[in-house]
From Swiss-Prot:
GO term, biological process aspect, one: aromatic amino acid family biosynthetic process
Gene Ontology molecular-function annotations: chorismate synthase activity; FMN binding
Identification of the protein by name: Chorismate synthase
Record field: catalytic activity: 5-O-(1-carboxyvinyl)-3-phosphoshikimate = chorismate + phosphate
Species for this entry: Lactiplantibacillus plantarum (strain ATCC BAA-793 / NCIMB 8826 / WCFS1)
Nucleotidyltransferase recorded as keyword: no
GO cellular component, one term: cytosol
Gene behind the chain: aroC
Disulfide bonds, paired cysteine numbers: none
Cofactor: FMNH2
Protein family according to the UniProt entry: Belongs to the chorismate synthase family.
Cofactor details (free text): Reduced FMN (FMNH(2)).
Broad EC category: lyase
InterPro entries the record matches: Chorismate_synth, Chorismate_synth_AroC_sf, Chorismate_synthase_CS
Subunit structure: Homotetramer.
Length: 389
């Protein structure tokens, strides 16, 4: 079963990740990983840091000649902006009057600053914000891209896209395949499946930036061809939809998760929500609709998995809100760090990545994942077993 850990601060020397449980024999496409990292840096409404960073991953363990070994995979992503913060973010040199000049003592409402400082005893809130920054998600995207490549070898494909930015909702054809969605969102810089609203949303983001404010939005992820039976109804913590919800909520700024119709299902009758069952001699078992987003009883049911995430607006405001200085206890405006007007576009890449990670975790927990060929054979045999059930 796969697991991972990340380390590193936003303006530290680098981000580091260790991914365990990936089968041996997977031919990694490094360019594809870097393409995912570049997509995370894109999108209308990003801040100036994206002009500094040009993220590329370096594999330093667990891969030989481009092929995974089955051992832990170690990855790094350099922080180019560290050159401007080398003294302030030096991991080793003792603190001095010079390298502590940019202390943060005015916590930002909505950020981890104040509570993180209280919990860990930090008087310089930079010690909190450097790790709680969404910069860390670059490594989760790199790890998620590896998982996506493994899923593709099992003919499982997924995509994350933007469904809403601020008050602007996009009406999309929910029956589109992953390939069709990918083709549509590639046509604009907001990852929208319908480009009609792009000019209007550009104007909204520009006006919001001028006002010193920020915007959130809604992300939708669709995964196709996931076999039925991943996860389990037998205990609360083995339900895969619960694990997906936890992973999505673990992404910075996410405040809500829906599976399938989610909260909308609560306002309908059961006869309108439950997905009727069908069977075909060739295709096997299916559902006539997909209101439940590919899950029943905490298990995948073979239909496309649909996960939606609500992202709050970024808490760093260029027109800062009221706060209190933790050193003087005097009421002041919150501190300002370089930030984005909206990060909903990169967040869609991050949420897509963590969904890929959790699906890979479930697959490698269910089937022998020692090497890719065996995993493919086992999953293929399992699919046939389900078809004949």
């Amino acid at each position: 079963m796969i697991n991972y850990v990340t380390a590193g601060e936003s303006h530290g020397p680098q981000l580091t990740g260790v991914l365990t449980g990936i089968p041996a024999g997977l031919q990694l496409d490094i360019d594809a990983i870097n393409t995912g990292l570049a997509a995370r840096q894109g999108g209308f409404g990003r801040g100036n840091r994206q002009q500094i960073e040009h993220d590329t991953v370096q594999i330093i363990g667990g891969v030989r000649h481009g092929v995974t070994l089955g051992s832990p995979i170690a990855l790094t992503i350099m922080n180019r902006d560290h050159a401007h913060w080398a003294a302030i973010m030096d991991p080793v040199s003792p603190a001095t009057a010079t390298n502590t000049l940019r202390q943060v003592t005015r916590p930002r409402p909505g950020h981890a600053d104040l509570v993180g400082g209280m919990k860990y005893g930090h008087r310089d809130l930079r010690n909190v914000l450097e790790r709680s920054s969404a910069r860390e998600t670059a490594m989760r995207v790199a790890i998620g891209q590896i998982c996506k490549q493994l899923l593709a070898q099992l003919d499982i494909h997924l995509v994350g896209y933007v469904q809403q930015i601020g008050p602007k909702q996009v009406t999309a054809d929910l029956t589109l395949s992953v390939d069709q969605l990918q083709a549509q969102i590639a046509q604009n810089d907001l990852r929208l499946p319908d480009a009609a609203l792009v000019p209007e949303i550009h104007e909204l983001i520009t006006a919001t930036k001028k006002a010193g404010d920020t915007l959130g939005g809604v992300i939708r992820v669709v995964a196709e061809n996931v076999p039925a039976g991943l996860g389990s109804y037998t205990n609360w913590d083995t339900k895969l939809d619960g694990q997906l919800a936890a992973a999505v909520m673990g992404v910075n700024a996410m405040k809500g998760v829906e599976i399938g119709d989610g909260f909308a299902a609560a306002s309908h009758y059961g006869s309108q929500v439950m997905d009727e069952i069908s069977w075909d001699e060739h295709a096997g078992w299916s559902r006539l609709t997909n209101h439940l987003g590919g899950f029943e009883g905490g298990m995948t049911n073979g239909m496309p998995i649909v996960v939606k995430a609500a992202m709050k607006p970024i808490p760093t405001l260029y027109k800062p809100l009221q706060s209190v200085d933790i050193a003087t206890k005097v009421s002041q405006k919150a501190s300002v760090e370089r930030s984005d007007t909206t990060a909903i576009v990169p967040a869609s890449i991050v949420v897509e990545s963590v969904v890929a990670i959790e699906l890979t975790r479930a697959l490698t927990a269910t089937f022998d994942g020692s090497n890719l060929a065996r995993l493919q054979q086992t999953v293929t045999a399992y699919r046939e077993e389900l078809r004949q059930y």
